[in-house]
């Protein structure tokens, strides 16, 4: 399974245009999570696709959309965990093995300072 992360402008119709590219290529999206992100007037889209070749075939078409700021295909072979953590002053992205991410989250005392927004 391939995980694709997009940073887009938070505007009406963006999801329709992004998903239209998957429809044109006949690519089935297994899961999708969308939400506002740490940057003002922007949103993050995280989706999963079963076939890496199909995921690679649609990336350039998605990058060409005006509303898309960034597209990243997450390398699953590294078995990394990604989490967006929201603190009072902003958001940070923690990357590492599952054990490393767990250790960082536990050290940060999330119940006091951090709210987990999305985790893959």
Where is each model-derived feature located?
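Long, contiguous binding/interaction regions
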Residues: 1-3, 7-42, 50-120
């Amino acid at each position: 399974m391939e995980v694709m992360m997009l940073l887009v402008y938070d505007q009406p119709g963006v999801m329709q245009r992004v998903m239209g590219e998957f429809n044109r290529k006949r690519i089935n999206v297994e899961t999708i999570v969308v939400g506002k992100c740490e940057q003002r007037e922007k949103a993050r889209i995280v989706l999963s696709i079963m076939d890496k070749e199909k995921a690679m075939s649609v990336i350039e078409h998605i990058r060409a959309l005006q509303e898309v700021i960034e597209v990243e295909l997450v390398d699953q072979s590294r078995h990394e965990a990604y989490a967006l953590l929201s603190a009072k002053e902003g958001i940070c992205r923690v990357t590492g093995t599952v054990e490393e991410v767990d250790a960082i989250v536990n050290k940060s005392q999330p119940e006091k300072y951090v709210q987990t927004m999305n985790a893959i």
